Amino acid sequence: MSQAAKTAVVAWLLAAVYYFYQYTLRSAPGVMIPQLSEAFGLTALGVASLVGLFYYGYSPFSLVAGAAIDRLGAKRVIPIGAAAVGIGALLFGSGSQEAASVGRVIQGAGGVFALVGAVYIATTHFPPSRAATLIGATQMFGMSGGSAGQFVVGPLISGGMNWQLFWTTMGIVGLVISVVLYLFLPKEESARAVGHGVKDTVRAFSGVFRNPQSILCGMIAGLLFVPTTIFDMIWGVRYLQEARGFEYVDAVIRSSMIPVGWIIGCPLLGAISDRIGRRKPVIIGGAVMLLVSMAWALYGKTDLFPPYIVGIVAGIASGAAMLPYTVIKEANRPEWSGTATGVVNFLNFTFSALLGPVFGWILQSVSGGAERELSHYQMTFEPLLYGVALAIVLAMFLRETGTKGAVAGRQKPEK
C-alpha cells in the first residue's frame, strides 16, 4: 500500500470514528426520556420534540458542510464540526431546557460534518469501484454509534449513571476528537479542479439541485431513513414498553437491534451493489425487505420469530438508504462530491426534521393524552409503511449509475 493510500485510509477512519461518536449522541436521548422529562419538566412528547431539534441543525447544515468541504478541504472543516458537537453536548447536559435546546441544534449542525466529511474522503481518495462499499462502511460506523447510544448507554443510565455526567463526559470527548482530527487529517492540495469563489459554490448547488436524479436520491433516502430516525431512535423504546409490554432493559436491547442491522446491512448492501455493478436492484430489494419487516414490527406477533430477528432484518434492509449517497455522487460532476453529499443529506434529513414533530403530535392526538396503547402507535406510524412503498416506486425512476448499468440508462453528470 502506497503512502497516499495509507493516508487516505487513516483520514477516512478518523472521520468514521467521529461519525460513530456523533451518532451515539444522536440516539442516546431515546433511552433517558424519563430522566429528561423529570429534569426539564416536560412530557414524553415534549422531550421528543426537544430531541428532534437535532435535525433542525443537521438538515440545513448539510448544505453548508458540503460546500465548505468542497471549497476548503476536509482538514479545515471537519474538526470544527466535531468541536461544535462537543460544545452542544456540554450545553445539553447543563440542566437548562433553553441551553439543552440550543445544544441539541448545535449537535446537529456540527454532526453533519462527520458523514459528509467521511463520504467526501471515500469518494475523492478511493477508486469509484469502492464507493458504495466505503459509504456503506461509513454508515456502519454511524449505526454502531447509534446502537451504542441505546445498547450501552441504556444500561448505564438504568444502572444509576447521572444523565448530566454522561453528556458532560461526551462533550469533553468531542473536543478531544476535534483536536485529533485537526492533527491527523491530511492537508489537501489546492489544485483540485473546483473553484473557490461564491459563484463556483452557487454553480455547484445549482447543478446538483437541477439534476432530477439528485432530488430522487434525497427523497428515496429520506423515506427509507425515517423508520429509524423517528420510529426507532425516538419512540422505539417507549413503543416496546407501552404497546408490547416489554421491560425497560429488554425494550432497549430490542430497539437497538435496528442500528445493529444497519451495521451489517450498510457495508453488505454496498458491497453487493459494487459487486454486481448496479444500484437500483439493491435499493429496491432492500426497501421491499424494510417494508415487510416494519409492517411486522407494527402488526405482527412478537413471539413468532426468535427475539431481535425482526429488528435486525429491518436494520439490514435499511442499509439500502445509503446507496442514494453513491448514486448522487455518480450522477453529478466529481468535483461537486461534497456538495452532492450535502444536498442528499439535506433532503434526506429534512424528512426527519419536518416529520418528527408531526408524528409526535399525531400520537398525542390519537391517545388523547392518556396512556398509549398498541392501536395508538399503529395508527400513528402506519404512514411510515406508505413512505417506504413510495420510495420503492421512486427508485424505479432512478437511472442506473453502477459500472455495469446500460450506457443509455446512465445519468450524465450535470455540467
Predicted feature residues:
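Cytoplasmic membrane-interface "Motif A"-like loop-to-helix N-cap segments
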Residues: R71-A82, D274-V288
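Cytoplasmic helix-loop-helix junction between adjacent transmembrane helices
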Residues: G103-G142
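Flexible cytoplasmic inter-helical loops of multi-pass small-molecule transporters
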Residues: Y182-A204, T403-E414
